[in-house]
């Protein structure tokens, strides 16, 4: 599976071949085909595994009460996954692009992340951590874009990147940007 993540991250879904995955993994192509009849089957298995990673990060975040604490916990959980297996996080970023290029591909990870952020923002409005006039849909999209952008940036660098430091900076930007609004509108 690791080789498949890496090849798809480098080449994209359309250019990925079983031959390249087999070569990279040290398996024969017939062995790969035994487990996955088609490239689509393999991609679905990778997506399922990546989706489990996303839902695990969301579960970790939901252990916290305050909005910013949840968001920070989610970011920290994704960074922890990055340190264990950057190819999975890179795949999550690429899966987002692939869902645009190939609308027939499933995008459950996108829906799960957006759903989590939507819940996060709507609960923040209910708890008055954000003002009642907050454009919730736009804020969800902004947060999603920031998280996705951080992952894309870290995943596509051709040099070492300290993802944890970048994540902390993102958390500071989000915290400093949201906290003053909360104080002002109470």
Where are these regions (language model features)?
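Short hydrophobic clusters on alpha-helical segments that form packing/core surfaces
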Residues: 3-8, 78
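Hydrophobic alpha-helical connector segments
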Residues: 45, 59-88, 136-143, 167, ...
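Short alpha-helical scaffolding segments that buttress acidic/His motifs in well-ordered protein cores
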Residues: 75-78, 92-96, 143, 147, ...
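Short secondary-structure transition hinges
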Residues: 77-122, 129
